[in-house]
């Protein structure tokens, strides 16, 4: 006899009899439901991954992801040299002086974030500089490179001057408290096509430190580039050098990324309900089949099949629906996600050449498929147990 017999009979029940078209339709309906649920889940989460990655590249990639600073407000690089900054998940370290500033031009006033950088070390904004070089930020010249949106808001062009004020570095005078301020020369702009164009500005690190009224040679801290910026929670828990403190992007953009993550989780939860409904469909269809097959189950028991084997027969039938549906759904979902930007213009959803960011994560697709299979398998337990509990004498009494 074909071994294992439970697998053979379970697959036969899955196919159904040729004459019983409605029974076969109900049996395959569960498979279709799981396929659609997994496909929708893979497609939507791939798009959400794309949005998350785009935000990470366009925002976190262009701003300080983390800063290792001193508890005293400014850091002396001699006391904590770059070689002492050895942290997990950090791939690059550079000095930085940064702070929130108020910008005043002849036409307008704006707020921004000053990034004091070393002109000799390449900055993430360097590829986006417009008609200016990073090396033009010479110390003592008080030159500044503005984001294009920020320059437009201030109404300034190359060659103009703006007043930069630091409210946190104010000084007391007979006329009251006056913020530290200095005139800077606009030598160019950068256009990263990101929101940082509206508030970031680049200056020489020495000029920035003088404006912040730091002791000579001091900086705000060491700028850290992270391997995985979104996993900053775990990175911030590691042991830091003595006397230092950790600051990261969550101070400025934590709420934005938390909202994106929550939206992604909620979309995943809602679409998981499709898989849950399909799982209930497995329970229903399998329960009806158990009632229909009670006579056959009794005959199988009289032929020597144990209750465990009877249970396996119906578990194979129900689980096969989940396995087939999960594999088909994962494959179709990945295919749909990869071709989404080609299909959207056909139905007129995307206009003007816009495209959805899509990032298919193989591990995520595999996890979704495995979870769908597990849900389908769990949904077979009760009907299969009911089938195994069938009493042959009772079932055959009216046959």
UniProtKB/Swiss-Prot annotation:
Gene Ontology cellular component terms for the protein in this record: ATP-binding cassette (ABC) transporter complex; outer membrane-bounded periplasmic space; plasma membrane; plasma membrane protein complex
Domain of life: Bacteria
Subcellular location: Cell inner membrane
Bilayer-crossing regions: 25-45, 270-290, 310-330, 358-378
Keyword annotations: Cell inner membrane, Cell membrane, Membrane, Transmembrane, Transmembrane helix, Transport
UniProt membrane topology term: Multi-pass membrane protein
GO molecular function terms listed in the Swiss-Prot or TrEMBL record: lipoprotein releasing activity
Pfam families: FtsX, MacB_PCD
GO biological process: one example: lipoprotein localization to outer membrane
Chief location bin: membrane
InterPro entries according to UniProt: ABC3_permease_C (IPR003838), Lipoprotein-release_system (IPR051447), LolCE_TM (IPR011925), MacB_PCD (IPR025857)
NCBIfam families: lolCE, PRK10814.1
Record's function text: Part of an ATP-dependent transport system LolCDE responsible for the release of lipoproteins targeted to the outer membrane from the inner membrane. Such a release is dependent of the sorting-signal (absence of an Asp at position 2 of the mature lipoprotein) and of LolA.
Similarity remark: Belongs to the ABC-4 integral membrane protein family. LolC/E subfamily.
Identification of the protein by name: Lipoprotein-releasing system transmembrane protein LolC
Gene source species: Escherichia coli (strain K12)
